[in-house]
C-alpha cells in the first residue's frame, strides 16, 4: 500500500466505524477500485499540490465560508466519497419517500390536522413547535407544493446501514458546494474520474427552475422566478448568487420587492415587473414584517398575504420549519406509514423523546453515553456529545433538559462511517455524513445523484459542520452506463440594480441566518 496510507487500517480499526473505501484490512471495496489505483500512483507532493490548487480555485471563485471571522476557501478533500449504483438506489428511494411524507404532513397540519385527529401524533407536538406558524394555517400554497427543495441528512452506522439523521425542508443549504466540488474534482483526480461512469450533478439548476416554474400561480403561462437573498453578509450568499446565475433568474433582496394588490413586483432598471415565484433563502421570521418580526429589514411587507391570496408562490412554503423540528423527526416513520401506507426505506436513528417522563429519566441517568440535541438546533450548535463532555457541561445540560424537556431529544452516539482524508503527510479515516438534495415539482420527487458529503477534519470528531471546522468531499454515484452532459440554461436579461448594494445588517440577524442555513 502507498506510504500515504501507512497505518490507515490500524486507525480505521480503532475508530470502530464502517469504512467507505476499505473492507476490514487494506483491500479496497470494488466501488473504490479506480480511486485506489489512482491514489497509489501519487506521491505526497502530488496530492498536496492538487489540494492546494483546488483551494486556490475555490478562493478565486468565491467558494468560501466565514470561520471565526476569517474568509476561507471551503475545504474540499481530494478523496471522493463513492456510492455504488445499488446503494444509491436505496438512498434515492428512501429520500424521495421521506419528502413525500413530509409534504403530506405539512399539508395536513396546516389544514385538517387529520394526523392529530387519528392519534398518530399529539396536537402539542405541532402547536408547541417553534416553527409552527398559525399565520399560514388554512391556506393552500399556489402550485400546491410546500417542500420544493429538501436536504435529508443521512449517515451510515458501524454495521454499514444507512439511517436518516435529520430533515431539512425550511432553507436547506449546501448544494452550491456539490456543484463546485464536482467542477474541482474532475480536474483534481482525473485519473479516476475519467475511468468510470459517474452520475452528473449539473442537472440540478434545470430541475430546480422547472419545479419552481411548474408550481407558479394558476393562470401564469410564463412565470418570472427570483431568488430572494438576505444580502451579501449572509453565510450562504455565494450559493444564492450561483443558483440565480445558473438558473438564469434574478437575485433580489427584500427591498427590491413591492407588494400591491396581493401581487408581488420587483424594481428593475426598466421599471416594475411582476414576480410569480420566489425561491426564498430567508428564514420565515424575517420574511414579512407584517406577520413575523416587525424589525426585519430582510423581507418585504405583504408577502404572506400575497401568497395566501394565490398571487405568488413562495418556495419553500412558509411554515415548513415544523417538519425540521427534531421531535417531529422521531415521528416520521409513523408519518410514512400513515400517509403513504409504506414501510420506511431508510430507518431513523433511535431517538429518545425527553418530554416523555420514562425516556427523560433513562437519558438523565446516561447523559455521558448519549448525544443530546436541541429540537430546533442547526449547524451542530447546541448539541452535547456525552462521552466528550465535561462534568460541568453535563450538569448544565441536565438543568436545561429539566427546564424544557420539549426542547430536547437524545440519541446514541453513532460511529459515522469514515473515508480516507488527507491529514498532514498521510490519509487518515475521518467521519462523514451525506446530505442528498431533492426537488419536488408536485408530481415527482427528483433526488440529485450524490449530494453533499461533509467530513469531520479532526481525528475522532463527529462534528462535520463547516461552521465548526468541517470540510467536504465530492460524492460520486456510479452508473452502469455512460452519462449525458447537462443542458445549460439561458441567462436572465433583466437588471434589478446596476450594482449589488452593501448595506448594514444587525449582527444578531447575520448570526441567526447563518445558524438557520447550515
Predicted regions and their residues:
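Preference for protein termini
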Residues: 1-518
